[in-house]
Amino acid sequence: MAAAKRIADEPAFVLHSYDWSESSLILEVFCRHQGRVALVAKGAKKPSSNFRPVLLPLQPLWLSYALAADGNADIHTLKGAEWVGGHVMPTGDALLSGLYLNELLLRLLARSDPHAALFDAYTGVVRVLASEHGDALEPVLRSFELLLLRAIGLLPSLAAQTMTLAPLQADTRYTLVPEGGLRAAAAAERAALPGHQWQVLQHALDDAASHQATVRACAPVCAELKPQLRTLLQYHCGSPMLRTRQLMIDLQAL
């Protein structure tokens, strides 16, 4: 019998884990070269398992795994996991924000669809979440939301009105909506940006260093951008509401 094909030393993050048996876990991981992958971590729940202290969310890992013998199977077998190190686990709002991004990736990324640039952006966001992030948190979150939507083909061009392809006027306010894309905002719509700011965002997304450029472009417009992206993302994620979003609402109500 031919040996199972193996993926070795793959940069990855754990997005989510759940019980598979009394001693094992199913992992949903985001890999740089393989995309979103499901793995069974046999024995990972045992106190003696080398996997147990390593398979945590928001921690950079090197993973090795054997592909399922059935080439069409979705779940592969974890063979090795090594913590890369470099930062501590985020806490507080930063931890919730990281889990929110993980949930977006779980809902929106198809299995085995690689997005290396998006993985690199995610790595940068996690680094910020684990640091004394201060005012940097909101811009990196908004930037990643834009990059994610663009990577999976759900973000229209921000340089023109979506339905008419008419160019944006610098001082006219426009809003981003789920079914109509970018359109002129009504007077009562508060979540909108002037045309020149949408164009700045588009230029940033087109930049070779799109993550850093988009973070800078998002910084002055986070308050206006946040509700528009939240609505767009929830629309594409479908029902029910994102669990992390509901948790944030519940905590704010306390």
UniProtKB/Swiss-Prot annotation:
Role summary: Involved in DNA repair and RecF pathway recombination.
Alphabetical list of Pfam families matching this protein: RecO_C (PF02565), RecO_N (PF11967)
Alphabetical list of SUPFAM superfamilies matching this protein: ArfGap/RecO-like zinc finger, Nucleic acid-binding proteins
InterPro entries: ARFGAP/RecO, DNA_rep/recomb_RecO_N, NA-bd_OB-fold, RecO, RecO_C
Similarity section: Belongs to the RecO family.
Entry keywords, A to Z: DNA damage, DNA recombination, DNA repair
Protein name, UniProt field: DNA repair protein RecO
Gene Ontology biological process terms in this record: DNA recombination; double-strand break repair
HAMAP family for the chain: RecO
Record has DNA repair as a keyword: yes
GO CC annotations on file: bacterial nucleoid
